[in-house]
Every structure is written in structure tokens, then in C-alpha cells.
Amino acid sequence: MTAPMQDRYGRPLRDLRLSVIEACNFRCGYCMPADRVPDDYGFDSQQRLSFDQLETLVRAFVSVGVTKVRLTGGEPLLRRDLPSLIARLTAIEGIEDLALTTNGTLLARQAVALRQAGLRRITVSMDALEPALFRRMSGDRGEIAQVLTGIAAAEQAGFQRLKINCVVQRGVNEDQVLPLVEHFRGTGHVLRFIEFMDVGSCNGWTPDAVVTSAQLHERIHARWPLVALDANYTGEVAQRHAFADGAGEVGFVSSVSVPFCGDCQRARVSADGHLYTCLFASQGHDLKPALANGEPALATHLRQRWSVRGDRYSEVRASVPRRGKPVEMFLIGG
């Protein structure tokens, strides 16, 4: 592997978020609201990168410094025969961590196959425990029982330390914070609370809808005292805190209130092969022409694109007007 490339601010590229499908079986309001995204939304399957293309793309990213790959969507478990892609990616030398983010509804039937294929970690999105609220937040498409069954199946398949992500919106699900903590304390899984972010243009974001990590920390700490932990690695987005009684840990992702642009080492690629160097980007770069020329040519192209990267949207959110229409979260996996 050659030396890792760096962008204009000296940030290397270590982490690839790879969307394998743009479709989703949920219609969550903060990502893919039902009143803005039709039920039949999705690319023609011919527009999606094939497994051969995805493997070549990942090999090129690894050759320029990527060590962590996370498969996203949409809902990645909707992609047919996903375990076979995972098996191919697992065989790539240099990948230290291969993970997947899912809403969990299809996990029960696929957990064993995912584990056998070589997937190392799973993150499950779960914004409420209360069944009626969960159903409503999913656009009347999901049941919390399905997700909990999926988590149990993942445990049985050998995934012992899942991450559970909850996006907290004021007036929507902030009353679910303590019940979620109580449910996952002591299970070995890591619950992470994510500030509601202005990703895309269809989620109706306003600053008033944000419950900050500091506010969430105060609420949880009053019930279960917390102790701050060091980050596991440079660029880790979640601020880690352990329960003082030893019942595990909880994390806070504070992109709005405490931006972490300075340590961002991530690139995102959509299912149709467009590179986004920031979650809040308004323009992607089509990688398919370079991809068609093979892995070495794509690697050279990636170095060129990353070297001019200057994204730091969250740090300048309040002072610099946004230009262009931002990419939707469901295209690049959050």
C-alpha cells in the first residue's frame, strides 16, 4: 500500500461509506420522508454499480489508504445476494474493518449469512422503543418487534457488540432517550445518540428541532452517572462515555453542536458510483469513467480528487450560505 493521501487540510482518507442500494423499506422523516419520496423510488438496477465494479472500487480505495469500509443504503439488506459481495470484500488485503448499517427489519433472515461471509460489525438504526411511535417514525412501514428480533438473531450469529444509532428530534422522540438507554444498558451493545442534521433538502430541518448532545448527556447522567472515555481512534465521530456502574457505554454524535470536520477521514460513494467527500455535499463526482479504466487508474483519480478536498460544512454552517441542492441522506448512507 502506498502512503495515504491527504486533502487540503491534511486529513487522510481512512474510511469509505459505500452505498450498495438507494432504495429503502422505511420512510423516516429525517432521511426519506414519505410525502417527498414515492414508494417506488429507486434507480434502474442497471445504474447501480455491479459487484465486480464495487470490488474494483474498494480495492482502489484501499490502495490509497482506506482501512475501514461500511456498507450502507438506502437499506443495504435489500441488495440481492449481499453476502456474496461481503465475501469478496473480506478477501481484500488491507481492510481492517468491514461493517454494515441497517434498519434491522431484514436482519433476522440474513444475520447468519452475513457473519459467514465475513462481516465484522453491524450498526442498527433505532429511533424509538415504543411500538406506535416507531411505526410512525418509519413512515408506517416498520415494527420495532422486527428490529429487536433482528438484533437477537445477530447476537446468535456471533455479532456480540452492535452499535444502535438513534437520531433525536425535539418534539418527536426525545422521550425515548431514557427508555432506550435502560433497554440497552448491560447488553454489551453501544447506544449512540445522533443530533438531527440538515442533510439533504427534504427533511424539514430547523435548528430548533435539534436536541444537543450536551442536553442528552445531562439527562442521561442525572439517571445513570457517566464517565468520559478517550476516543478509540483519530476521527471517531462519537464522544464516548461509560456508565459509572460498569454497565457499558453510550455515545453522542454532535455534528451540529460540536463539529468534527477537522478529523473527518471519510469518503462516501453512492450506489450509482458518485463520490461525495462530505455528508453535506451539494455535488458528487462520477467515478464510473475512471472505474472503467481499472483499479490503478481509479486510484490515481481518487488521489487527485481527495487532494483538492476542502469540505468543512459543519464548522461554517452558521456563517457561510449553502450553495446548490445538498445530496439526500438516503443516497449516501448518513
From Swiss-Prot:
Top class in the EC scheme: lyase
Annotated GO biological process: Mo-molybdopterin cofactor biosynthetic process
Catalytic activity: GTP + AH2 + S-adenosyl-L-methionine = (8S)-3',8-cyclo-7,8-dihydroguanosine 5'-triphosphate + 5'-deoxyadenosine + L-methionine + A + H(+)
Gene Ontology molecular function terms on file: 4 iron, 4 sulfur cluster binding; cyclic pyranopterin monophosphate synthase activity; GTP 3',8'-cyclase activity; GTP binding; metal ion binding; S-adenosyl-L-methionine binding
Keyword terms: 4Fe-4S, GTP-binding, Iron, Iron-sulfur, Lyase, Metal-binding, Molybdenum cofactor biosynthesis, Nucleotide-binding, S-adenosyl-L-methionine
The keyword Iron-sulfur appears for this protein: yes
Residues annotated for [4Fe-4S] cluster 2 binding in this entry: 261, 264, 278
Cofactor binding summary note: Binds 2 [4Fe-4S] clusters. Binds 1 [4Fe-4S] cluster coordinated with 3 cysteines and an exchangeable S-adenosyl-L-methionine and 1 [4Fe-4S] cluster coordinated with 3 cysteines and the GTP-derived substrate.
Binding site for [4Fe-4S] cluster 1: 24, 28, 31
Residues annotated for S-adenosyl-L-methionine binding in this entry: 30, 74, 125, 197
UniProt pathway annotation: Cofactor biosynthesis; molybdopterin biosynthesis
Cofactor(s) this protein requires: [4Fe-4S] cluster
A Pfam family hit: Mob_synth_C
E.C. designation(s): 4.1.99.22
Signal peptide extent: none
Radical SAM core domain location: 8-244
Role summary: Catalyzes the cyclization of GTP to (8S)-3',8-cyclo-7,8-dihydroguanosine 5'-triphosphate.
Family: Belongs to the radical SAM superfamily. MoaA family.
Protein name per the record: GTP 3',8-cyclase
UniProt lineage: Bacteria, Pseudomonadati, Pseudomonadota, Gammaproteobacteria, Lysobacterales
